[in-house]
Amino acid sequence: VGIRAFSSDLISASSYLRDYVEKGGNLVTQYNRTDDAWDSQTTPPRPIKIGSPSFRWRITDPNAEVHYLVPDHHLLNKPNKINQNDWKGWQQERGLYFVDEAAENYQKLLSMADPGKKPLDGALISGKIGNGWHHHCCLILHYQLEHQVPGAARLLANLITPADWK
């Protein structure tokens, strides 16, 4: 589900998306603003609170160092092993509208910081929900893809690949 896609029309599909994940689906959602139709309790399959005010929940330095919080997680390893080279050449910024809090199903996978600021760890989260997975990505992948940043394409491939892919 693309950036800021949760409008009033798509909100009505939240229960369908939740059911899809619980039955084994792989759902990828991208960033949403707190003033979009995103309800932290009912829009995602399990609660996810977006940080507010939004200007404090973003990484504006496209060269900010990225740390792996769960390095063996499948999103960082299949089908592509995501490494520090994948963060080179990023344009504009790393991401925005980061997650502040999430249900215990979710793991926060990355940490990064703007110069002189505290690290944020809500850029990429992943949770096992029933028989499926929900990944919420606040990185600006669409912008990186427009600028042909290979690491963004590699990470996107990982996001859409089922967890049991061999």
Predicted feature descriptions by range:
Residues 1-8, 140-141:
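The substrate-binding groove and active-site-proximal loops of carbohydrate-active enzymes
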Residues 28, 48-55, 59-62, 82-85, ...:
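Extracellular ligand-binding/catalytic regions of CAZymes and related secreted enzymes
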Residues 13-15, 94-96, 122:
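A generic local structural motif
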Residues 5-91, 149-151, 155-157, 161:
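A glycine-rich, often tryptophan-bearing local segment used as a flexible ligand/cofactor-contacting loop or short
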Residues 93-103:
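Active-site Gly/Thr loop motif
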